[in-house]
Amino acid sequence: MLIGKRLNDRYKLLKMIGGGGMANVYLAHDDILGRDVAVKILRLDYSNNEEFIKRFHREAQSVTTLSHPNIVNMYDVGEEDGIYYLVMEYVPGQTLKQYIIERGMLPIGEALDIMEQLTSAMAHAHHFEIVHRDIKPHNILIRADGVIKVTDFGIATATSATTITHTNSVLGSVHYLSPEQARGGIANKQSDIYSLGIVMFELLTGRQPFSGESAVAIALKHLQSEIPSPKRWNENIPQSVENIILKATAKDPFHRYQSANAMKRDIETALYPERINEQPFYIPEDMEATKAIPIIQQEQLFENVTDETIVLKGSKVDEQIRKEETDLSKKKKRSNKWLKILITTFLLLAIGITLALTVIPGFFIPKDVKVPDVAGMKYTTAVNTLVEKGFEVTEPNIVYTDDVETGDVIKTDPVAGRVVKENSKITIYQSGGKKKSKMIDFTGKDLESIRTELEEKYKQVTVYYIEDDRPKGAIVEQIPTSDQMVVEAEQELKIWVSKGPYQIRPGDFSRWTENSVTGYLNERKLTPDIKREYSDTVDKGLVISQSPKPGTPLKEGDKVTIIISEGPKPKVTKTVKVDNISIPYESSIIGEKKPQTIEIYKEDMQQKMDRPIETRTISESATISLEFVIQEDTKGRYKIVRDGVTIIDKEVPYPTQ
């Protein structure tokens, strides 16, 4: 259990605030500078893994090179008792991923502001030839004031180094992985730009562009499928903004932005009036052919190198000479063999007797040694001093006292100055500081009811508010915990207080598709309640309204009512017959009946007034009947024209009964 441990006698670990595959992150307090810091500790099961230790050190080297307001600062790096740790800036807030889950798709202005900060940070890293290789919302922190910080350079690498993944393994998170990384190839600055484009897509739509049943399925989509248009989920995205995403996520790195600064400049001007409706980004057809990028195998890097040792063969003459010399030497050695054995045996016996009588007893009789005075020393210094003198140091006895500083040595047993045998056991009495009492458990209590008591009892009380299922105002967690011994008057108390259950604030779903909104709600464990209504203004299948309204705080399991448009309401039509329409004949000369031309016009659901439905001639008055197909809330109409003069023009109302 690392909570409560001090690293380097300086960084006190307070609580775990995050974790990943290779390391855990703790909130800690820097006792020297009096500030909170984040301490990233390599998991103990990897502390003997050389590859993970190298990666851990690589993160420290990467970040210490950088100094940028949107990159987490690195303060210190160290190793203690097999614990490898990095000390970094503590950023209060949440990850960008948590922010997106809570808020959904972000307003365009806010999303562009975040992307400006992100591209600025990556441009700075790229300037120092550092490629992050794992850009994703999970590795980006956002403060309450909207400032973002890029973190987790654990798999970052210098572009001058070989960046080919060994044994075709893939580094990075599959939803944000560039095609070249998915192939197991080289990761470069354009790989980070691709990941930035995916993050921008998620900010503006509330979702990732690709999903699948497995990591392999998603990686294949990055390799083979074009990024879908973000307008499919957010029709308010201007063309200039969509173009940035499409260019950043081009399959071929050659077609992407060539630098993070170039992408940043496009983001800064994306909402200029002259750019809003610019032409869609596309890759010329002659450049769209798929090019297979081979994986660079490790053995290819060394194919011209050989480790064989070459032995040059001698001549047959030389071999014969060596053979004769060897035979002669063997004959001489046999003659002297027994004489040498006798002399050697005698000498060994003489030496053994001498050692047994003089030297060897000194090895087994311990020397007398005076116990040194280590009182007032730091514990580790005292241990080293005693070990150097040949003593064995046992576990320390902790003594609480106001007279000796915490951690310093009070005395030893045997006492200083006493003469004892070498290798004797020495017990150190170490100061535990002032008398301590067991920490009180405040969890579950209401903060306001005990705030005055806490402020009087402890040196300092720091309160953090978090979302929790426990009642608002209840203390959820505390540091120190109730199993620790503390000096109350000198103790700083940190408490975490519930501000109510975890809340989700859905965005505005207006004109979302039914599938998109149900997917969004299900992902956040909200219950969609779908209802349907006719609408003259919203296309069929799109969201008309929602309840509760956008931005309302909700908790998991809450119901959200969504009204989906059925399109315009169909209107009823009826057939109306008008009988006995009289067409009068009018002669200008008495007694003479000259034929007159009659044109009959009709307007209803099936006919317009732009041409006559019938033309006839009459020599006397006539009567006709007309049928009209009339829709609810509309009218029919007919017109009679005689010799070019309109003589009848009437409306036919929709029957109310």
Swiss-Prot record:
Any one GO molecular function term: ATP binding
Residue ranges annotated for the PASTA domain, each copy included: 365-432, 433-499, 500-566
Predominant localisation class: membrane
Modification Phosphothreonine occurs at: T162, T163, T165, T167, T290
Spans within the Cytoplasmic topological domain: 1-345
InterPro entries: Kinase-like_dom_sf, PASTA_dom, Prot_kinase_dom, Protein_kinase_ATP_BS, Ser/Thr_kinase_AS
Protein name: Serine/threonine-protein kinase PrkC
Lineage: Bacteria, Bacillati, Bacillota, Bacilli, Bacillales
Gene expressing this chain: prkC
